Amino acid sequence: MALSTTPSQMSVALPTRIDGSSRSMIKVQSISFTDKSWGPPLLRLDSKSRSLGVKKRSTICMSLQQSSKSKVLVTPLELEDPKETPLNLFRPKEPYTATIVSVERIVGPQAPGETCHIVIDHDGNVPYWEGQSYGVIPPGENPKKPGAPHNVRLYSIASTRYGDSFDGKTASLCVRRAIYYDPETGKEDPSKAGVCSNFLCNAKPGDKVKITGPSGKVMLLPEDDPKATHIMIATGTGVAPYRGYLRRMFMENVPNFKFDGLAWLFLGVANSDSLLYDEEFAGYRKDYPENFRYDKALSREEKNKKGGKMYVQDKIEEYSDEIFKLLDNGAHIYFCGLKGMMPGIQDTLKRVAEERGESWEQKLTQLRKNKQWHVEVY
């Protein structure tokens, strides 16, 4: 079943809903990630690929752009059973061969660069938890090691353990295409382009992809307290793990996880066209105003209070008193994105702490000791 990327009113059959009915029809405005009709069509499996067993589901809903108060019942619930975090089920020497389901550009024409949402079918063989990463081995030979494969590239998983089709068989990645421009000529140099990101963004439905993992425990979503506060800070594709958190909190009907706390997302990007999953997050804010807050920093469109560019650390400073009070009360705080985001954020937090008469070094030590501090930068 191919879903149109053009925004329109349509009905889609979803898996069993919370009310127990075997099929329900939910009307949504759009199935794509963006309202930008200029973009290329969403790539999906054709009937031939499905007949080969790439996708054997009569009902496929790759993503819901808008939140619905009627949550989707996910399967298989056995994915909730393991007590131990799934780690390194597949390693670089023996990766798992998965299949590309779809590739979709999810930024607008004025975004500096291209970012794609990529759905991968692992057929339930590479289970993972929210906040973990997959490794991807692009095809070809490592130029620095003739005869050897390329090095593994890690990507944070942008879906819950049930995937975008809610059946535990897929995982989604949020990938920015890495392109190199010569600083002297200003021209693109394809020889220095990111091998793995370009492979993924150029992939077609049915293409094979070698994956490793899952890996990582630092960004796992703590679920022992459903009333906990989670402060999530990201730049660009660093929003990937938070999409997984938020879908688990607000979109999926998971019997053993009924979130009733506060999730607060700070997202820093260049401009409005660079916002990732914006409509999805806006839907949560509309449906769950008491449980979800969403603040954006658009560096090329907004100014901070000093008249400079608005970065995510400026938003943190704007709400610093509230953030510090939440941290004092046990809130978890997460950082994901480029390494370059951390110095500015750390400087801001240190300055705010000093203004409050606190030692940031002591506070940070305590946050780490209490396992409230989660950082994954690249």
From Swiss-Prot:
NADP(+) binds at residues 231-249. The modification Phosphoserine is found at S197. It is an enzyme of class 1 (oxidoreductase). One of its GO terms (biological process) is photosynthesis. It is found in: Plastid, Chloroplast. Pfam families: NAD_binding_1 (PF00175). Its cofactor is FAD. Keywords: Chloroplast, Coiled coil, Disulfide bond, Electron transport, FAD, Flavoprotein, NADP, Oxidoreductase, Phosphoprotein, Photosynthesis, Plastid, Transit peptide, Transport. Residues 349-373 form a coiled coil. One of its GO terms (molecular function) is copper ion binding. Disulfide bonds join C196-C201. This is Ferredoxin--NADP reductase, root isozyme 1, chloroplastic. It comes from Arabidopsis thaliana (Mouse-ear cress). The gene is RFNR1.
